[in-house]
Regions:
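Extended, low-hydrophobicity, polar/charged segments
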Residues: 1-131
Length: 131
């Protein structure tokens, strides 16, 4: 599925590689920015979408963070630009489902994706989990 089918791709003039930079770019708090974290679970990759201000307890998942090279290989996107729409299993923090809109990676350092978290679940693109 194309990113445009899930939300609005916002082109930026300056690169955004961190939650803080993304929040500044759209003029919102860091709590409105989400990050997509890719983990390696014994050679199988998964992605977790969570609020930019939250940390993912990778050890409790029995996984490890994917290396930048693994992220690119597994998703086709660089670290910092990974969107929430992927060809690997995606899990979204259920606390995000109450948000009208959030902003996440848009596929590169010069774009963000504005989307409704609930749409990912309704379209079968992500499974809600308690993180």
């Amino acid at each position: 599925m194309r990113l445009e089918e899930v939300g609005e791709v916002i082109a930026l003039r300056t690169p955004v590689r961190t939650v803080r930079e993304a929040a500044r770019a759209v003029g919102l708090g860091e709590d409105k920015i989400v990050k997509t974290i890719v983990v390696n679970c014994g050679g199988k990759f998964r992605a977790y979408i969570l609020r930019g201000t939250k940390r993912l307890d990778v050890k409790s998942l029995g996984c490890r963070l994917a290396t930048p090279e693994e992220v690119l290989l597994a998703t086709g996107y660089p670290v910092g630009g990974v969107p929430p729409v992927l060809d690997i299993p995606v899990f979204i923090d259920e606390e995000l489902l109450g948000e009208d809109y959030v902003y996440g990676g848009g596929g590169n350092d010069y774009s963000l994706l504005k989307f409704k978290p609930r749409d990912l679940v309704e379209k079968g693109l992500a499974k809600p989990v308690a993180l």
